[in-house]
Amino acid sequence: KFKKDNPIFEVRDISKSFDGRPILKKLSIKVFPGECVGILGPNGCGKTTLFSMCIGEQNPEGGKIYLNNKAIDQIPIHLRSKEGLGYLPQQRSVFNMSVYDNILGIAQISIKGIENQKAITEKLLDEFNLQHLRSLNASVLSGGEIRRLMMARVMINKPKIVLLDEPLAALDPLVIQDIQKYILKIQSMGTAILVTDHNVKNLFDIADRSYVLGEHTVIA
């Protein structure tokens, strides 16, 4: 189903510890273009630490991370999104302004020309079912609506891969099903996905394949 000769994203033998306590040991993961890959593991197993290294918040003590065959530590942090990396943190991360301006504000940073910026904003409002919320301040949105808004913003740069850190956490079952549909919509746009969760069913419903983390590395 997916070409397995050239990963769009690779974690190769990554290790990390805090205060002498190992968090990750020689962790290796591959994501190929267009596929949705899950990382399953309990809270505290290192999933968020892995993503923080991918976006440059932390540095690994050993191993390498590659984005489109380029060592990610050779790509300046502010250019990683232009190289095709998108990231959705677990915590709510929106601006205290309207839904429309939340998307347009990011578009103005990333895209040239006000008409192009407005066009992509309208397109993403449609794609993620946000048109009816466009004038609302993002601070009043529900958990599921916040997730859809964050997904819309991360797609502005048309990333090659999106890292989703526990996007289904603290959501009601019906909202989880709704957000799963939008995760698959991102994949249908041609974007690969690496998504973490501690619930096996949540990943089973969306992932083409999954890695299981335990004892600081992949165990299955």
Label each region the model flagged.
Residues 115-133:
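Conserved ABC ATPase "signature" region
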Residues 137-141, 145:
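Conserved ABC ATPase signature
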Residues 40-42:
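The feature captures the beta-strand-to-loop junction immediately N-terminal to the Walker
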Residues 63-71, 83:
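Conserved ABC transporter NBD signature motif
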Residues 55:
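Helix-to-loop junction immediately C-terminal to a conserved catalytic motif
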Residues 19, 101-116, 127:
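ABC-type ATPase nucleotide-binding domains, specifically the catalytic core motifs of the NBD
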Residues 162-165:
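Catalytic Walker B motif of ABC-type/P-loop ATPase nucleotide-binding domains
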